[in-house]
Structure formats: C-alpha cells, structure tokens
Amino acid sequence: MNRVHTIAWRLLTASIVLCSCFAAGTVAQTASPSPQPSPTPTPEAKPASQEGANPFTPEAAPPLPAGMTGSDTGDPRSRLSPGMYEAGEAAMGIKHLMLLKKPDAFQLGSDDPDHPKVQKALSLLGVADASKIPKSQQLATAGLAFANSDLAFQGNHLFLGNFYGVNIYDISDPLKSRLLTSMVCPGGQGDVSVYKNLLFMSVEQPNGRLDCSPQGFPPGPPPAAGQEKNPPPPAAQKDRFRGVRIFDIADIRNPKQVASVQTCRGSHTHTLVVDPKDKNNVYIYVSGTSFVRQSEELAGCSGETPDKDPNTALFRIDVIKVPLQAPQSAQIVSSPRLFMDPRTGALNGLSSGGTHGKDGLEKPSDTDQCHDITVYSAIGLAAGACSGNGILLDIKDPVRPKRIDAVNDPNYAYWHSASFSNDGKKVVFTDEWGGGLGARCRANDPNKWGANAIFRLANNKLSFASYYKLPAAQGDSENCVAHNGSLVPVPGRDIEVQAWYQGGISVMDFTDAEHPVEIAYFDRGPIDPKMLVLGGAWSAYWYNGHIYSSEIARGLDIFELTPTQHLTQNEIDAAKAVRVAAFNVQNQEKIEWPRRLVVAKAYVDQLERSQALPADRIADLRQAIQSAESRKELGKLKSLVPSLEQSAGLTKSAADSSRLRALAEILRRPAL
C-alpha cells in the first residue's frame, strides 16, 4: 500500500497544512531521488488553500478522459448499503463463511475522539497536538494505527500482519477458526512471512522500537513556517527500529524476537527467498519505500541524489542473509542497484516514462524503489513492482539479483505487486493508483488506471497483453484499487483471487492473457457513505481449499468458492486437492496436481466448456472415470489415452492442448 507516501502520511497531509500539528515522524515514501518527499494533495486530501477542508470528505470523480471506459454502475455491487458490520453484501461464486473481528487490543474500541486509546493511536502516528484536528478526522486517522495488512500461512496457522503487531489464528477447521496469539509490536506495515520456526515482519514507520514496546517516541515540534510541505525527519533515536524483525515461533503462543535487522529506509514489504542450492540459509529481499533516516541514527544512511552521493540509500533494495541455525546473526549481505543503466553505470537508469495525473500526463520520474518483489525460484526469476516500472530479475544467485528486463506504462501510476502464472509464461502486475486511500473504481475512473496489467513472458522478455480492472463501479467514499492476490490452483486455467480494498474480492481468469474475465466476486457496501475511511480487503489468498482475506478495518474474512457456469464443482475440488505446508505469496512456489481422477474430471469439464471435444467423447470420458472411481476399472481409462494425445496435437488452442495432454497422463496412471 502506497504511492508516493505511506498511508499515514497521506491520511495526515491535510492536517499538516491546515493546522501544522504533527511531527515529521510520519514522512514517508519517495518516488523521486529527492531525499525528503513533499506531500502531494490527492482528490481526497485537498489543497491547503481550501480553508477548513476535510481530507476525508469524498469527491466525485472527474470526467472520464476521452477514449476511456469506466466501471459498470448497473452491477449489484454498486448499490450496497453502508456500515461497519451491517453493510450490504453481494457475491457471485463465493460464499462468505465467517468474519473474525479484530482482537480488542487491535481496535480503537471507542467512537469518542477523546478516548485515551484514540489519543494514544494519534500519538503513535506522530500527531503532536490532536486538539487542532477536527474530531471526526481524529477518529478516521487514528484507525490507521490498527490497520490489518498482509497474510502468511504455515500448517494450520494463519499469520495476520497489522500496523500494531501480528495476530496468529488456528485455521485447522476453517469454520471454527480462532485466535491463538496476539503480539503487540507497532511499526507498520507489519507485513509477514514465515519459514519453519521463523516469522519475519516488516517495519517502516518511525514509531517502531527495538523492543516492540508500544509507546513510540515523543512527537517532534510542529514544522516551522514554510516547511509544512517538507518537514525535517524525526530526531535520531537510538531505540528506534525500522527494518525486518525476526521471531522464533517454535512456541506459537509465545513468539520471541531473536533478531532485528535495521535498514536505511525501513521495510515497507519484504520477500522470503529460498535458494534450492542452499539448505542452511534463507534470504530476505527488503523493499524500502519510506524516507531515508539520518546517519546519526544508522551509520551509512544517505538520502542524497546519486550525483551528490554514490552511496545513497536510494535506488536499491537490501538483501538479508538469515542462517537457519543462528537467525540472531542475520545481516545485510548486499544492496543491489537494480535500476542501474548498464551502459553508463548511472544508478537512476529507469524512469516511469510519464504517467497520468489530474492535469494530464505527468513528467517521467526516476525509479528509486521497489514496492514489492515476487520470486519464483523454480524458474530462477523474480518480478519486481518498482514504483515507475515493472522489472524482471534473474535470481539464480539470490544475493546478487540481476535485472534482465523492464517495462513502463503511461496508464500506470505506481507499480505495486506482481504474480507469475504457474507455468511462468505470464506476469500480472498491479497499479496502486491513489496509494490505497483513494476512491479509484468510480464510474468515471478509467478501467486502465489502477488496474492489473497482464504481460506475456518469453525468452526473459515481457510483452504487454491486456488490462483487467474490477468491473463494478464503487462509491466516492470507498477506497478501491488493485491490490494483493494469489493464484487459485484450478488445473488447466490461470485464475487469481485478488483484493480491491473496499471494492471487495474479485476472481480473475487470465488463461487467455488478452481477454481476462471475472468469474467470481464478493463485496460489501462502504464503511461510511459520507467519509472516506480506510478499509476493505488488503489481501485475498487461496490456502488449502479456502480464501482468506485481511480486512483492514474489520478483521479476518474466510470464504469458499461455489460452482457457477464459470467454475464447476469438479474444478473447485481439483483445486482443493492441492495441499501445501506453508504459503508466502511473494515466494511463489510451483503448483503440482496429484494424478487423481477429480483432477481429470476438472479437465473434462474444461474441454466441454471450450468445445474442444464433441459431446459423445465427453460422455465416454465421464463414464470411464465414473467406472474407475466406483469399480476400479482402469482398462477403459487407458484405452482413451491415444485419442486424447492425438487430439492434443490437432487442436488450435494451446490451453486445450495442455489440458488434453494432462488428462491423458492422469488416465494412463491414475492415483486411486
């Protein structure tokens, strides 16, 4: 979540200019080489010239640009009633099983702005004098201190990151999921990954402390006159922590911090990297998007431009090596310059190429950060979503990742995250236009802005195929844009479930890269119809048969897919046949399907849907599979293999050819 600033800064920007009331501790991301970013008002954060303006008051979308198409106002998701827990709901192909509300310690717990917990939350966010912020804005702002963020999974446990710490759930029975452990440890965003007995957590905000204690640091003085838009960084603190925390979770009810690796820009997100050739260590790619801290606080940190300091902390990621037998010895082992121009050696070798803005095309800006990196070790590649660019990395040597391709797009405002198709032949990038706080799915918001961009990948080169955006128009008070998702392991298809903040959850089929389609969804009405309150689905991931979503304001949602004309029960059952021991979405692992007949039935359904085989052959296949299931008669199955292989060589559809070959392989040697 971010574009040019952390969400904390975006929420508080208008309060700075209206009242000059909080410290620079919440200053954050920069998408330019400037060492200290300047707030950029968005439609939700109005210019200071509008005296008394409320930055949370929704604004209608500007006119749709010529030649662009917006979202569908006729969709049932566009007319849902508002509310925190009583909001209207709409769903297709998804059943909502339960919502586990946030634990009390991770909620404001009061609608009274003067409540001590509300005031403490504002202090954590760097507000020096809350009395100068209107009461309604105080509540909306304070909620950020307890925002849910990303998810990770291991065995029967789900790890839910939060700006205030981590919550661990027992999901051994998804219908009876329950909270096991709450660990208070502020610092935001709190993105998490897990490997064996280790839990990793990203910390970026300046309220993080080495010992995880929640008191933060005293807010600094208000910015001096003329510095409201570019306040100084917070005063150096020896106990401040910004980087990656490492916990030992051998005792799941009592995590112990065993290491804390400091970085110059903190860790907005991180990526767990497992080297198949190295059994003794794991690696962490750290994506820092926040301001560069002072060298007085962490030696060697510099936020200067490359021409002033070639050792600048900008224009790089950090790689942490974690010895599995001695995680307390974790340390940064390299800081790759992923954006370097190989011809000139210039660190700022990539730029956005220009993007869209309120007043038309904006000038290109240098890319100096990655927001998120997804590694796919099975193919030795990673896809980086890096502010102004999407990049492709060779990670065969995980300590020294090398950029091998890069793309940009004038329709993209901020390259946010990436996912590979299972065969590694496609990459889905997301654009977080509006930084996650903006309402960007309104009827007049173009469906190429704040969308997914699907690229084909061949010979280590990316080529654009199409866009996909949530098709349903959302309201002016609903923050909505493309966000985090994962593959759904339906064999024979490329399907991704994805979070869209208050746009809900959308399931996209991108098997045909040029024509992606929505096949399922779930959505709620706005939290507040009159105020843009940060909420909705941060992440939506498939894990061992269910969909889990971190709802920013409400808690943990659990879903299951249901059959429709777009997805059969056999396809859902085949996806459920895939079981994994752990899941960290940025560390993508190859999906392998068992040679079970339920998987064969899914392929048959797909071949019927695409009309790749005539009806009589579909009927023969189903009859043979049924006989094998009920009477263990395998002879008929094997007799069908030659004709399937022949059809695979004749069909013009690459997808159907792959399905036919996979089906033939199962029928030849089914696992009963």
Segments and roles (model prediction):
Residues 24-28:
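Sec/Tat signal peptide C-region and signal peptidase I cleavage site
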Residues 571-672:
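Soluble extracellular-acting proteins and domains
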Residues 29-603:
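Feature marking well-ordered beta-strand scaffolds used for ligand recognition
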Residues 20-21, 425, 671:
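Hydrophobic alpha-helical elements and their junctions with loops/disorder across both membrane
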Residues 11-23:
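Bacterial N-terminal signal peptides
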